[in-house]
Amino acid sequence: MQMPAMMSLLLVSVGLMEALQAQSHPITRRDLFSQEIQLDMALASFDDQYAGCAAAMTAALPDLNHTEFQANQVYADSWTLASSQWQERQARWPEWSLSPTRPSPPPLGFRDEHGVALLAYTANSPLHKEFNAAVREAGRSRAHYLHHFSFKTLHFLLTEALQLLGSGQRPPRCHQVFRGVHGLRFRPAGPRATVRLGGFASASLKHVAAQQFGEDTFFGIWTCLGAPIKGYSFFPGEEEVLIPPFETFQVINASRLAQGPARIYLRALGKHSTYNCEYIKDKKCKSGPCHLDNSAMGQSPLSAVWSLLLLLWFLVVRAFPDGPGLL
């Protein structure tokens, strides 16, 4: 086995051991879902990856954002709060750069509006709940997205931010994360079913942090498109990893005790989108053909090394089904 693969296996083992430690810390809770849904491919979710139209979307943001602020006061207030916080952090950057715990510098192409969007999403406000509820329905039709989805700017900026943060990560780029949900038990279609999480899904690198959000359903997830956003969150102690709505997963194990929580273990498969560049197509492609890059639309298989890591994780889950770190 090559040394990088061996080191990756070691890192996974260390991560699993850390998950078994019972360490607690204060955390601000954010309810993630408001209704019960089956865990499936979430076909009504709006899953645009903006392949081939990122520059055109960026150019359209000023007018689009102004219009959306007028339609949603919660969105406008959260964005204002996040903008203020981002400016404060930028002013403190010289001080942070001397600290051993300083955040990593943003990746190439990461702009201020990406940082503001992530801060707005993680703020202790109703925005993330309203936004994800809208994302889960905006893909029911192209017309519904164009005429009724009032978070086009936020969806684009979060999507592009995760793409940039993901491309800027050092290997390994996949992460073992945990996700706790309060007041809702998800029901997967069955073992080995292919599913998506339906919206922008918050998870944590720390098992204990995820528990604070609930245990009615508790996920163990291998994500390869989710990106750590600790340095762009109002609550860095959560060690949050944000997963985009177009990442696909395979259900490798699921259980539900009679009076206990549902436990679901997912491994990354790739990505799948029904939509691409819908806003730009509507605004600029009516008078003639558009040439957009659709390379990001389909499924992308995992590497052999990551498949081996996922197998190792599954074996640990099977060996310790009731371990406190794998709830």
From Swiss-Prot:
It is found in: Sarcoplasmic reticulum membrane. It catalyses: L-arginyl-[protein] + NAD(+) = N(omega)-(ADP-D-ribosyl)-L-arginyl-[protein] + nicotinamide + H(+). Keywords: Disulfide bond, Glycoprotein, Glycosyltransferase, GPI-anchor, Lipoprotein, Membrane, NAD, NADP, Nucleotidyltransferase, Sarcoplasmic reticulum, Signal, Transferase. Its EC number is 2.4.2.31. NAD(+) binds at Y121, R179, S233. InterPro entries: ADP-ribosyltransferase_ARG, ART. Residues 73-273 form the TR mART core domain. It holds the Pfam family ART. GO terms for molecular function: NAD+ poly-ADP-ribosyltransferase activity; NAD+-protein-arginine ADP-ribosyltransferase activity; nucleotidyltransferase activity. Gene3D superfamilies: Toxin ADP-ribosyltransferase, Chain A, domain 1. Residues 1-22 form the signal peptide. This is GPI-linked NAD(P)(+)--arginine ADP-ribosyltransferase 1. It comes from Homo sapiens.
